[in-house]
Amino acid sequence: MINEIQGFDIKFNEKTSRIINIDISDDIIGKLIFPFNKFDLTALEYKPFTRFTVAKSLDDLSNNKLSKFLNDIIKDRNTGCFIIKPKNITPKINDSFLVKLSTAVAHLIGKPNHDAMAGKYYARFHVKHVDKSDSYLRKAYTNMDLHTDGTYVKEKTDWLLMSKIEEKNVEGGETAMLHLDDWEHCERLYNDPVAKENFVWGSPRSKNIDYKVEHPVFSSDDKGRAQISYIDQFPEPKNMEQGIFLQ
């Protein structure tokens, strides 16, 4: 699934054909400066319509091809993932610009869920050398094991967009992605009867969610293929069978 869109360098990721790399040219970035500068971050946070305005600014520069391409990628089970970024980082690309770019990309796909932890339509945080938070999310030296988003909230989570805005004094720490169809244990776990039982899912205090939800670890899509919703920190097993299954 490789399209040609003027101003965007599109190719398969060097490590897997399941990920599409999209590099935004300097020309496109330059043309985004003016429309992005119409709104500061406070405006984007307070006035939801502005988020779609910056999204349209980006899509217009692709002759409205980018929005369709991004949606085609995430709806295709064979891919489902893209990495989009400026081809070159220039002084004009600061943290505010990158938040606006992420906002634009997200709103070309759909309307993001409200983030209860941040109290906004997006969450932004630092990963530092020392961390005293109550979840693995911000801990620099602790591996986050198998992890999908949306396990402990009532809203349906179809896709996730993550941005790395700045990195200093760091070695390693690359994001690890695993396609469910490439996971060697998926079929065995998916076919385990416990996988379809309702589990209770809670969250630490920092998430600002005052309720718990119930749902299975595994479900099926409209073609009977495995889907998973799981974060190892949040399930609360009801019995020994559920606890052992989670191992």
Language model segments and positions:
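Short, solvent-exposed beta-alpha or beta-beta edge segments that form flexible loop/patches at the rim
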Residues: 62-69, 75
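A gly/proline- and charged-residue-enriched helix-loop-helix capping module
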Residues: 103-137
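Glycine-rich, histidine-containing beta strand-loop boundary motifs that form or position
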Residues: 86, 116-120, 164
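Active-site environment of non-heme Fe oxygenases that use a 2-His-1-carboxylate facial triad
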Residues: 1-61, 76-78, 125-247
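Generic hydrophobic alpha-helical segments
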Residues: 69-70, 175
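Short, charged/polar micro-motifs that form catalytic or ligand-binding hotspots
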Residues: 88-95, 148, 152
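Signature of the catalytic double-stranded beta-helix
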Residues: 94-117, 240-247
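N-terminal, charged low-complexity regulatory/assembly segments
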Residues: 48-54, 72-92, 101
